[in-house]
Amino acid sequence: EAINQGMDEELERDEKVFLLGEEVAQYDGAYKVSRTYYMSAGLQPVPIVFRGPNGASAGVAAQHSQCFAAWYGHCPGLKVVSPWNSEDAKGLIKSAIRDDNPVVMLENELMYGVAFELPTEAQSKDFLIPIGKEGIECEVINLRTIRPMDIEAIEASVMKTNHLVTVEGGWPQFGVGAEICARIMEGPAFNFLDAPAVRVTGADVPMPYAK
């Protein structure tokens, strides 16, 4: 409902905003779209948002349970966001629609049916969550945006706590957690670690079927 509310408000705000569904547009139209804005030095904006379920879900097994965060986050020119709660979902979908770059919004299908309290601030039509900024609660960093990644916030947390644990639903090899660990190793926060960084990931196997 938060995603729908965000889209409804943006459709009402800007007459140029519209929706397209699967296989209703001309074939091949979306290919290579991610580089257009960058390659034109910002002269040709590509304000398009791709929404879709991401990660494990009940009863869909290996065919439909992949985590695409690392896949899309690997592509220069794309912005990748991943909301956790209703506040994230509404604020990020509105920011994504207003962005001049193509944005991929990865939505956890298990969260669609979960009720979250929506703060009064988030109920405003002007509510936005900036892409590229994390959410922090008790040193738990809700990354929200996969690309661009707010590495400065992660570094600040490591320098404060002297520890790093990454948690993701995707596979361990070449994942988002691996990227975070690599950036910490390459940056100023590495010398603040009191212990090796730890990654918590999905198992390195296709997702089994379960209801």
UniProtKB/Swiss-Prot annotation:
This is Pyruvate dehydrogenase E1 component subunit beta, mitochondrial. InterPro entries: PDHB_mito-type (IPR027110), THDP-binding (IPR029061), Transketo_C/PFOR_II (IPR009014), Transketolase-like_Pyr-bd (IPR005475), Transketolase_C (IPR033248). SMART domains: Transket_pyr. The gene is PDHB. The pyruvate dehydrogenase complex catalyzes the overall conversion of pyruvate to acetyl-CoA and CO(2), and thereby links the glycolytic pathway to the tricarboxylic cycle. Its EC number is 1.2.4.1. The keyword Phosphoprotein applies. It comes from Mesocricetus auratus (Golden hamster). GO terms for biological process: glucose metabolic process; pyruvate decarboxylation to acetyl-CoA; tricarboxylic acid cycle. K(+) binds at I48, A96, I97, D99, N101. It is an enzyme of class 1 (oxidoreductase). It catalyses: N(6)-[(R)-lipoyl]-L-lysyl-[protein] + pyruvate + H(+) = N(6)-[(R)-S(8)-acetyldihydrolipoyl]-L-lysyl-[protein] + CO2. The modification Phosphotyrosine is found at Y31. SUPFAM superfamilies: Thiamin diphosphate-binding fold (THDP-binding), TK C-terminal domain-like. Keywords: Carbohydrate metabolism, Glucose metabolism, Metal-binding, Mitochondrion, Oxidoreductase, Phosphoprotein, Potassium, Pyruvate, Thiamine pyrophosphate, Tricarboxylic acid cycle. The keyword Lyase does not apply. Heterotetramer of two PDHA1 and two PDHB subunits. The heterotetramer interacts with DLAT, and is part of the multimeric pyruvate dehydrogenase complex that contains multiple copies of pyruvate dehydrogenase (E1), dihydrolipoamide acetyltransferase (DLAT, E2) and lipoamide dehydrogenase (DLD, E3). These subunits are bound to an inner core composed of about 48 DLAT and 12 PDHX molecules. Interacts with DLAT. One of its GO terms (molecular function) is metal ion binding.
